[in-house]
Amino acid sequence: MLKKTVLGLTAGAMLLSAGSALAADYKIDKQGQHAFIEFRIQHLGYSWLYGTFKDFDGGFTFDEKDPSKDKVNVTINTASVDTNHAERDKHLRSAEFLNVEKNKQAKFESTEVKKNGEGYAVVGNLTLNGVTKPVTLDAKLIGQGNDPWGGYRAGFEANGKIKLKDFGITTDLGPASQDVELIISVEGVRAK
């Protein structure tokens, strides 16, 4: 009897651990504020200016064993840009930069995910300021597992770089201020 119980528990544990490695859909946990889309750009070459987008939504599919099944989709409310300075934020929302009246959303949709050393290369199309261009993000799995509320979570950090001019933003900010670095941290809750 004990032998059957141990075998049953072992088989059950193996099935549960195998289930966590299969492709699963995750919703970005923005309700719990466990996700951030941030950026930084040099200010005149003297310092870094940091900003964030406060309103976005999306999800991802994650299969640790087969990254070719992975997908990422994120939609950002461009008017939610926040650099902790009201006048600058107003300027960033203007037609000189994000043109939020005309382009209310920015979107990222992956086209390919592949293993890249200890992390992943997430290749996709970024639509910003009405222009769509390919972008590659370097992503790393931070961790995954059960949460205290009966769910399962996975968290990632990703970094990338874009050129303002590639997205039709041609305001001259000086040569040191043409590239924007993206810093993304997301925690997803697996769909039940």
Curated annotation (Swiss-Prot):
This is UPF0312 protein Spro_1887. Residues 1-23 form the signal peptide. It comes from the Bacteria. Pfam families: YceI. PANTHER family: PROTEIN YCEI. It is found in: Periplasm. GO terms for cellular component: periplasmic space. Keywords: Periplasm, Signal. Belongs to the UPF0312 family. Type 1 subfamily.
